[in-house]
Amino acid sequence: MRLKLSLTPKQDFSFDKINKHTIQGFIYSLLKDTEFGEMHNQPRFKFWCFSDIFPPNDFVKGEDKYLLISSPREEFINVLYERLDNLEEVNLNNFKFEVSELKKFDLKVKNKFITGSPIVLYKDKDRGEYIKFYDDDFDLMFFVQRLQDNAVKKYKAFYNEEPVLNGFIFDRISPRVRNGRVDVYVRIAKKGREFLVVGTTWKLLEKIKIRKEERKFYKFIMDCGLGEKNSLGFGFINPIK
């Protein structure tokens, strides 16, 4: 299930003033004193994701920005909706926004997807090394296998069952090149420290045919997100026609 927020800034400021950690903290603040209130302290999959804020240009007073939040937990989305529905104004990094529109909705499973935020995968988690498209040793099959292994692991943790999946998670993938690059370096500020997270963006992630028994798995990844750090807003995907 998904939640779309239309946020109207009450002043002008630069786009980089709000980062992924800002949005994650905002979502956790909405969950306070709910059944999901202690989620941030739990060392396990969170099973939710959010998109990049769009359009990706500077904030202008009175001009709407949009944010999508998704989760396979319907109740999680319901809690956020109820909290936000009672608020006329929200703060993100001390910048005030009017909640001009709030919408809950579900999407049908399609066989093609596009990234709404970079997909993050570790090449070596112990060493903190991310898979980078432009590394000399980049291996597309290794990337797809890591993507699949991570998705299956999360699915099993959520449903306590094996997913039905025939073949690879995707049959065709095509990178999205922005400013001449596929790799996206995102600077995250947390507790006064900054660190870089490296992800990749894709204009096409396609499974040629999704069988009826596979739809549950693809609905899950569409709601949960792909790769690592989903609750930090990485790996958000949208279905395309």
Swiss-Prot record:
The record marks 46 as: Transition state stabilizer. Its EC number is 3.1.-.-. It comes from the Archaea. The keyword Manganese does not apply. The active site is at residues 28, 40. Keywords: Antiviral defense, Endonuclease, Hydrolase, Nuclease, RNA-binding. One of its GO terms (molecular function) is RNA binding. GO terms for biological process: defense response to virus. InterPro entries: Cas_Cas6_C (IPR049435), CRISPR-assoc_prot_Cas6 (IPR010156), CRISPR-assoc_prot_Cas6_N_sf (IPR045747). CRISPR (clustered regularly interspaced short palindromic repeat) is an adaptive immune system that provides protection against mobile genetic elements (viruses, transposable elements and conjugative plasmids). CRISPR clusters contain sequences complementary to antecedent mobile elements and target invading nucleic acids. CRISPR clusters are transcribed and processed into CRISPR RNA (crRNA). This protein processes pre-crRNA into individual crRNA units. Belongs to the CRISPR-associated protein Cas6/Cse3/CasE family. This is CRISPR-associated endoribonuclease Cas6 2. It comes from Methanocaldococcus jannaschii (strain ATCC 43067 / DSM 2661 / JAL-1 / JCM 10045 / NBRC 100440) (Methanococcus jannaschii).
